[in-house]
Amino acid sequence: MKILFTNDDGIDSHITRELYETLSAEHEAYLIAPAKDKSGQGAAINLRTAVDVVKLEDKIYSVDGTPADCVFMGLMAIMDGLPDIIISGINKGANMGDDVIHSGTLGAAFTARKMKLPPLAVSIAGRSFENYQSSILATKLMLEYIEQNYSDAPQDRKSVV
């Protein structure tokens, strides 16, 4: 699968980087994340401000913008062709209840869905993020499930959050 990864914790999030490295071994993956933490930005985008994009490594980009900006930049300026799925996370925080309207993780997923692309948003609940490897495994298993069960589904039926 061709995957666009983003998050709201920023390009330096070791959890997102490890997820990217795990899945890029088997998939064509791009990591396009905010230059710094943009938690709480929801689906906000920069309308009247230039958004700088810096290529850090092959298929890894830092965007001076929000998680939703990262999705737009990936689709319109960075990636060659559309991704099969956009994965947002793994977020440090639960993203439950009223928090969902402010979540940058979910904002990126909502933006992907608005662009008619399937999103997968992943968050970790709890006070400690030391055991994040189980979330990486869960994401990998979800992606395998999606590949096996939704690859032939119509585009408008591929939303997973």
Task: State what each model feature region is.
Residues I3, S13-A77, G81-L82:
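A cross-family phosphate/adenosyl-ligand binding-site feature
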Residues F5-D12, D99-V100:
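Short, glycine-rich nucleotide/cofactor-binding loops
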Residues D9-G10, A35-D37, T66, I90-A94, ...:
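Acidic, glycine-rich active-site loops and adjacent beta-strand->loop/helix elements
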Residues G81-G126:
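Internal, conserved structured core segments that host functional sites
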Residues L120-N149:
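Short, glycine-/small-residue-rich phosphate/pyrophosphate-handling segment
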Residues N149-D156:
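Flexible, glycine/charged-enriched surface loops at secondary-structure junctions
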Residues V160-V161:
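Conserved small/polar residues in nucleotide/adenosyl-binding loops
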